[in-house]
Curated annotation (Swiss-Prot):
Belongs to the acyl-ACP thioesterase family. This is Acyl-[acyl-carrier-protein] hydrolase FATB3, chloroplastic. It comes from Cuphea viscosissima. The gene is FATB3. Residues 1-25 have a biased composition (Low complexity). One of its GO terms (cellular component) is chloroplast. It is an enzyme of class 3 (hydrolase). It is found in: Plastid, Chloroplast. The keyword Transmembrane does not apply. It catalyses: tetradecanoyl-[ACP] + H2O = tetradecanoate + holo-[ACP] + H(+). Its main location: plastid.
Length: 412
């Protein structure tokens, strides 16, 4: 009805007494037109013309009305197209609306994904620039990264240090096809190996905490590089952990230490920071006598997944081996708050190691000291270490003692 009304609005009404004119196709119009003169009321005459569209065929015959009589004739001509009206000439709005809806749904989905990704606490955040060389990244402590105390393990922290180091190199464009290797290092088959690691723990992050790691590099002697890390609580800004390390270059084929070539030095020196290490502990490590060790763990061997892409045992594994010989009662009553580790020799695939631990008689307040030795069964030293331990919860002012994570979530 709406279409008929809209169509009739485009046709003029005849004046009174006007007879119908022949249609477009002579005396055989394609529509049925019935003019009539209704009765006029006292207000004046009103002329009305009714137009009713009819199908051009009825049982195969054309139908028309001429001079008050109904005549039929077999349709021998081709069928005429349906009349063009205002409605029939409108575009198909349903297709346009469908296309617009599809575009908006896709855009909304993409925006939702980007918005969700930006709110994840463990993704790579935009690195801040401090003299163009510092790097910052956030992490969320997950359930499989904690121990029985709901705190992150020392291995978790070491893995975080390694991850931020590689991402720092990547952000500077120094990461080539190797594991932390620059283009010039790859040409000369050189890799980085850590020679010393020091860690100080004020408080361990707990399950659900979001931490922020800041790292930078500086020069260490003529043929070394040092890297420092600071771990802070994203919620309070409290410095939780400090760590510093010294690195040297080793030839991947000969497995011997190497000087830093001038070409490599030109790649890395522009990103060095002129600053002192965050930990300055010059105390020397004493070599243990295996016979006087308090605890020994034998038969330690590297597994296939202990090696990195440079075919080098990951430095995190050395710390795990070192702690294998620490008595269980130490872990039950104390927590590790300080670590110094010096790497002396590389561990090979077929190496068999033993871990030795001895308690140091000297004490620093309520802290206990332990000396460590990691060596091959043939007697060659792999690493020397010293650890400091304090009573549990002595340094905990966060989730363990308050019952809440840095995000305000309960850990009970």
């Amino acid at each position: 009805m709406v279409a008929a009304a809209a169509s009739s609005a485009f046709f003029s009404f005849p004046t009174p007494g006007t007879s119908p004119k022949p249609g477009k196709f002579g005396n055989w119009p394609s529509s049925l037109s019935i003019p009539f003169n209704p009765k006029s009321n006292h207000n004046g005459g009103i002329q009305v013309k009714a137009n009713a569209s009819a199908h051009p065929k009825a049982n195969g015959s054309a139908v028309s009305l001429k001079a008050g009589s109904l005549e039929t004739q077999e349709d021998t001509s081709s069928p005429s197209p349906p009349p063009r009206t205002f409605i029939s000439q409108l575009p198909d709005w349903s297709m346009l609306v469908s296309a617009i809806t599809t575009v908006f749904v896709a855009a909304e989905k993409q925006w939702t994904m980007l918005d969700r990704k930006s709110k994840r606490p463990d993704v790579l955040v935009e690195p801040f620039v401090q003299d163009g060389v510092s790097f910052r990244q956030s992490f969320s402590i997950r359930s499989y990264e904690i121990g029985v105390d709901r705190t992150a393990s020392i291995e978790t922290l070491m893995n975080i240090f390694q991850e931020t180091s590689l991402n720092h190199c990547k952000s500077l464009g120094l990461l080539n096809d190797g594991f932390g290797r620059t283009p010039e290092m790859c040409k000369r088959d050189l890799i980085w190996v850590v020679t010393k690691m020091q860690i100080e723990v004020n408080r361990y992050p707990t399950w659900g905490d979001t931490i922020e790691v800041t790292t930078w590099v500086s020069e260490s002697g003529k043929n070394g590089m040092s890297r420092d890390w600071l771990i802070s609580d994203c919620h309070s800004g409290e410095i939780l952990i400090r760590a510093t390390s010294v690195w040297a270059m080793m030839n991947q084929k000969t497995r011997r230490l190497s000087k830093i070539p001038d070409e490599v030095r030109q790649e890395i020196v522009p990103y060095f920071v002129d600053s002192a290490p965050v930990i300055e502990d010059d105390r020397k490590l004493h070599k243990l006598d295996v016979k006087t060790g308090d605890s020994i763990r034998n038969g330690l061997t590297p597994r296939w997944n202990d090696f990195d892409v440079n075919q080098h045992v990951n430095n995190v594994k050395y710390i795990a081996w070192l702690l294998k010989s620490v008595p269980t009662e130490v872990f039950e009553t104390q927590e590790l708050c300080g670590l110094t580790l010096e790497y002396r020799r590389e561990c090979r695939r077929d190496s068999v190691l033993e871990s030795v631990t001895a308690m140091d008689p000297s004490k620093e307040g309520d802290r206990s000291l332990y000396q460590h030795l990691l060596r091959l069964e043939n007697g060659a030293d792999i690493a020397l270490g010293r650890t400091e331990w304090r009573p549990k919860n002595a340094g905990a002012t966060g989730a363990v003692s308050t019952g809440k994570t840095s995000n305000g979530n309960s850990v009970s």
